[in-house]
Regions:
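Non-catalytic helical/linker scaffolds that mediate oligomerization, partner binding
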Residues: 1-483
């Protein structure tokens, strides 16, 4: 047994912050920008309830404060945009005929508008829709000229502002998944050893395979998140989920590329597939957008966050609300309260009946142990469910069952501790001893007792693997009443 238990502790943020009894199992991801780019402002967000971030300062917070927060890097992907506009904006009306060009960066007028897509004239066809500024403006292709310009007729007009995004919902674009900028950014992500990297505009599973190959070539432990925001990704969703380490429902562009009425069902299907494959899933975009400049969310936003929790998302994400909003910490705190209330009153815990292990699966035996650990924890009304993992697989599987009992994961892999911050219900601890299984379980119970998570008389379900030194898949299950 360890002589000094404290050196193995992951200092759980909820315990140290005095809110261990209000731990929210659905995690919060916050985007960092000018509104929260200082150490003190970031610390406010962390104390409010954030579990994963896109930021540099987090490492300092993880070192100096009692938190383990994930760092998530975002690759922009092939985002198409219009160029500059004369007078800062170009009024367009239904029926206007415009010319799009990718050959020269002209200042936009009704005669010619630059679009940052060299293959535009090759990929679009007459009749294809082109959406601009998140779908606020819509045009349709009426002609493709011999010299490579694209003539369009305005369907829905307004003011065409500079640098606004362009979506091609009817077109299969031929750009690579990663741009030159993405490749440079990936080098930085690898160098900085970020926990997660999100790939934008994933279209097919090969996009994820390529990114994972690049990470593997550099011996990087960074895990990959596939952002689902293209109809083609939905067509290949099963394979993308299987190949990715996690998935993000990126509803901004998805809601432009798809008819808006199809987005709710798409979100639910993505979440369902991720839970069935034990892959963390994040619901993102415009969740609390009114709080960019207000102190209270719209009622529809409250329901949106609640529905994401009820559908089983591992995490919900804030974007402009924390990056550029006026009240970043208040937004996080408000979201945390919504999550806690839903989990307290309405959440459908224990999904193991939906996820019975399949005998043909290569991981059937370890899956069966995890499945029955969650079932046993439920039947015994256990006060804690404890898992051990080296790769993270056991943690992801146990989390996917959404167990009623508090879930604690121990790992000797320090890189995993932060990565697991994204998973539903997981509180992770670093523990590197490899003695007898009885000693390891004794240590785990002592650590959890020391932190105030369990006490004498509590029932605890443990999983592990034997023999310890062989690091096999989970193959052991034990239930204990603490003395």
């Amino acid at each position: 047994m360890s002589k000094n238990l404290s050196k193995y502790l992951y200092q759980d943020m909820d315990k140290e912050a005095g809110i261990q009894h209000t731990f929210h199992k659905t995690k919060i991801v916050a985007t960092v920008g000018p509104a929260c780019d200082t150490y003190d402002k970031l610390l406010e967000l962390v104390k409010a309830g954030v579990k994963a971030k896109i930021i540099e300062h987090i490492r300092n917070i993880n070192i100096t404060e009692p938190y383990n927060i994930s760092i998530l890097g975002d690759l922009q992907g092939p985002k198409l945009r219009v160029g500059e506009m004369k007078d800062g904006g170009l009024p367009i009306a239904p029926g206007d005929i415009l010319t799009f060009t990718s050959k020269e960066k002209v200042v936009g007028t009704k005669e010619k508008i630059y679009v940052s897509y060299p293959n535009l004239h090759h990929d679009v066809q007459v009749g294809n829709k082109i959406l601009i500024d998140d779908g606020k403006l819509e045009v349709v292709v009426v002609n493709i000229t011999p010299d490579g310009d694209v003539k369009v007729a305005v369907t829905y007009g307004g003011v065409l502002l500079p640098k606004k995004g362009v979506n091609l919902p009817d077109t299969k674009i031929s750009l690579p998944a990663m741009t030159e900028k993405d490749i440079i950014d990936l080098e930085f992500i690898i160098e900085q050893k970020l926990d997660w990297v999100a790939l934008s505009f994933v279209r097919k599973v090969e996009d994820i395979i390529d990114l994972k190959r690049r990470l593997s070539d550099k011996n990087s432990q960074t895990k990959v998140i596939a952002k689902i925001e293209m109809p083609s990704a939905l067509d290949d969703l099963r394979n993308i989920v299987l190949e990715s380490d996690a998935v993000m429902v990126a509803r901004g562009d998805l809601g432009v590329e798809l008819p808006v009425e199809k987005v709710p069902a798409a979100q639910r299907e993505i979440i369902r597939k991720c839970i069935h494959r034990a892959k963390p899933v994040i619901v993102a975009t415009q969740m609390m957008e009114s709080m960019i400049d207000r102190v209270k969310p719209n009622r529809s936003e409250i329901t949106d966050v609640a529905n994401a929790v009820l559908e089983g998302a591992d995490a919900v994400m804030l974007s402009a609300e924390t990056a550029t909003g006026n009240h970043p910490a208040l937004v996080v705190e408000t979201m945390r309260k919504i999550i806690l209330e839903v989990e307290r009153t309405e959440y459908r815990y224990n999904r193991e009946e939906d996820l019975v292990p399949q005998p043909h699966s290569p991981s059937f035996l370890s899956d069966a142990i995890c499945y029955n650990a969650c079932k046993l924890a439920k039947d015994a009304n256990a006060d804690a469910l404890v898992g051990m993992t080296q790769s993270g697989y056991t943690a992801f599987i146990l989390s996917s069952y959404r167990p009623r009992s508090p879930l604690y994961i121990f790992s000797k892999e320090k890189s995993l501790i932060n990565q697991l911050s994204l998973s539903w219900g997981v509180r992770a601890f670093h523990y590197a001893e490899e003695e007898s299984m009885d000693d390891i379980i004794h240590d785990q119970h002592a650590i959890l007792k020391e932190r105030g998570f369990i006490k004498t008389g509590d029932v605890v379900v443990n999983t592990g693997s034997l023999p310890i030194q062989e690091h096999l898949a989970t193959n052991m299950l034990k239930i204990t009443k603490l003395q």
